[in-house]
Amino acid sequence: MQAQAPVVVVTQPGVGPGPAPQNSNWQTGMCDCFSDCGVCLCGTFCFPCLGCQVAADMNECCLCGTSVAMRTLYRTRYGIPGSICDDYMATLCCPHCTLCQIKRDINRRRAMRTF
């Protein structure tokens, strides 16, 4: 009788990184406020509320929807080109516009059933 060689498992079966995101673009421009006036008004007059909505949409807690990290997470999740530096500069220069852009993008991806 032959002894069987031991099998060494180096990775857990069925667990690993998910599929790579497909390349896409933002659904609307950063200053494309008139494509969804409700989001624009909410971002202008109740910025913290919109930040909480975005955070909740992304299953995050607190007001981190307004942060560079949230924008970077969203961009990388959907394969949107850019860099952390781009996200930082956009969020620094116009936080209202960037937050509204993320919320419009979420709404459009939901409508397309890709969110």
UniProtKB/Swiss-Prot annotation:
Pfam families given in the database record: PLAC8
BP GO annotations: brown fat cell differentiation; defense response to bacterium; negative regulation of apoptotic process; negative regulation of multicellular organism growth; positive regulation of cell population proliferation; positive regulation of cold-induced thermogenesis; positive regulation of transcription by RNA polymerase II; response to cold
Gene Ontology CC: one annotated term: azurophil granule lumen
InterPro entries for this protein: PLAC_motif_containing
Disulfide bonds: none
A GO molecular-function annotation: chromatin binding
Tissue expression remark: Expressed at high levels in plasmacytoid dendritic cells. High expression in spleen, lymph nodes, peripheral blood leukocytes, and bone marrow, with lower expression in thymus, appendix, and fetal liver.
PANTHER family reported for this sequence: DUF614 FAMILY PROTEIN-RELATED
NCBIfam families on file: A_thal_Cys_rich
Family stated for the protein in its record: Belongs to the cornifelin family.
Protein name, entry field: Placenta-specific gene 8 protein
Annotated organism of origin: Homo sapiens
Gene field: PLAC8
